[in-house]
């Protein structure tokens, strides 16, 4: 979990490289969802993405209060299913549980990534629609 500004800024810079590729992003709306452990990073990502002219569909959570991560992974899947967006970002403490929850849905191809190269390759070569 990235919690300080230096790491958050680095993450946002890497995210910009990943999502700047025109053929990678076909729509400009990105769905964001997180559990309580991911809330601080999600809040930073919202500001960054808004500054890059992305539309944001925020599915929560909106506080540090403890919540069940599967609820937010499932909400992401439903948002992709009903067409609110084609891509999304999930954030939790490790990324593992929320990715597993989202991947239960046929239309979700969530990849757990740790760096810009992994994220970029997941999008370009594996057609991941959620990172």
Predicted regions: what they are:
Residues 31-50:
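Glycine-rich phosphate/diphosphate-binding loop of Rossmann-like nucleotide-binding domains
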Residues 37, 116-131:
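C-terminal binding/interaction regions
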Residues 55-66:
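A short beta-strand-loop structural module common to alpha/beta enzyme folds
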Residues 72-90, 94:
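Short, structured active-site "lid" loops
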Residues 90-108:
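Compact, glycine-rich, soluble single-domain proteins
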